[in-house]
Amino acid sequence: SADKQVTFSQGNLQYHPANNKWRFAENQSDYIGYANSNIAADYDGWIDLFGWGTGDAPTKSSTSYSDYSTFVDWGTNPIGADAPNTWRTLTNDEWMYIFYNRHNAQSLFAFGSVNGVNGTIILPDNWTTPSGVSFVASTTQGLSWDGSSYYNSNDNNFSHNTYTAEQWQTMEQAGAVFLPASGYRSGTD
């Protein structure tokens, strides 16, 4: 908006339990995948699929909502070379603005694939598609608004925007953001 802007990181947040270190993935389409099932306090590898609001306990994997009563943002930790509280999770109001409330919101996001990874593409308010690439809003291809949320009436929305790593670099340099659909956490799975 004219009075507020948010910044997205270069890639997914990742955590190394054995070293107690946080970092961002090198690319927006990078994600850990099945290795997330190794989640444990002493795991000597990187994970990037956390329980919601577990910034103070990133290896917590309970499936009970009562175990997550206090939200702790991951940004309270030092991430890479950044000091604690440099980064934070967007608020609900900020997500609502991006997907629903900003001018032309329905035309500024879509599902797509970057380098073979499915996810969501978010465009800035002042978007102009760069030459050499294309963009199709998923709302023109079967993603519908029901008055309170979007729902998918067509199962192939990820195929509407398919980019190679090089094509995505062009999109990213123009301000596009890609959030990989990396899965969901259910206990240690």
Give residue spans per PLM region.
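Conserved positions within compact, well-structured domain cores
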Residues: 1-189
